[in-house]
Amino acid sequence: MKLGAVILVAGVGIPDEEMEKFLEMKRPTIFEQMIVSYQRAGVADIALVTRDGMADKIEQTLHRRGVTFLDIESDSFELAVLKGLSYLSDTCERIFVGDIRFPFFQPDILVMMQKRQAELLGAVYGGMFGDLICTSQACARNICKKLEQQIEESAEMAEGTVRSIGVAAFWK
C-alpha cells in the first residue's frame, strides 16, 4: 500500500513573520522533523503546499529529502488541501493531511491510523480532534470534488456580490 502525506504550510493562517521564524530555526528544522516522522511511518510521497514562492526558502533545508513542493497563489486552506490531495490521490492508497503548526507526532500514530480501514480518520488527543487526518484514495477524490465545487460557488458568489453593487469586475 502506497502512503502519501500533504503538509500544509499555506492556508493555515500563519503570518509571514511567524513563517520567517520557522525558516530561521536551527537544524534540524521543524520541516525536517515532520518529514522524517512521516518517512519512518512508511510514507513514500510527501507534498508540501506553500504559498507565494515560499517553496524556494524551504527547499534549501529540505533538498534530498524526497519532498514535492506545490505552490499556490493565495493563503486559502481549501485551495491548499485541494492542491495536495489532487496531487497524491492518483498514486497513493492512503493519504495523511497535516498542518505545519502541529509538527510533532509519533510515527507509530501514523502506522495505527493507516491500518484502520476507515475512509476518513482524524487523530484525537484528550478527547478533541487534532490536525492530522488520514483518508482513503476514494475519500480524497470525493473531498477534491467537494472542494472544487465550494471554490467555484465562492467565486460565483463573489462575482454576484460585486455585480449587485454595480462595480465593474475584472476576473483573471
Predicted features by range, described:
Residues 3, 30-94:
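Conserved N-terminal catalytic core of the sugar/cofactor nucleotidyltransferase
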